[in-house]
């Protein structure tokens, strides 16, 4: 399951990540995912599902700076740290990633398809605001 997810991630996003952030960043993310224990992998997948649920709930409030949105952002940061590894997370990188979500139709399709139309823009707005406070 992990090997397939890594291969799909590489296929869909690898060239762009390597172009924007270098081979080392993509290789490190792949190694981090490959090195996860089954429990860590399951935890990451469960958190991903919970993030989508929280995104839908937060979007319903209409407030990207409200309590539901802040909870969403903290969950998303934790998910990134699980995938990027310890010591690689920064609010600036997180905010830049959020901007990339709305610029890339693949992410818009994923988030809007999972949490409703406008979810990607809401997530970006929430993350940019939250990251500015960190």
Q: Where would I find each of the regions flagged by the language model?
A:
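Amphipathic alpha-helical "stalk" segments
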Residues: 1-134
């Amino acid at each position: 399951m992990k090997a397939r997810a890594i291969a799909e991630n590489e296929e869909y996003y690898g060239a762009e990540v390597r172009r924007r952030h270098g081979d080392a960043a993509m290789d490190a993310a792949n190694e981090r995912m490959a090195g996860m224990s089954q429990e860590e992998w399951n935890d990451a997948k469960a958190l991903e599902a919970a993030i989508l649920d929280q995104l839908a709930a937060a979007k319903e409030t209409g407030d990207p700076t409200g309590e539901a949105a802040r909870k969403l952002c903290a969950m998303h940061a934790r998910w990134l740290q699980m995938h990027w590894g310890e010591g690689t997370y920064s609010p600036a990188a997180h905010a830049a990633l959020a901007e990339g979500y709305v610029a890339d139709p693949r992410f818009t399709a994923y988030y809007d398809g999972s949490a409703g139309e406008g979810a990607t823009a809401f997530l970006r707005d929430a993350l940019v605001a939250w990251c500015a406070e960190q």
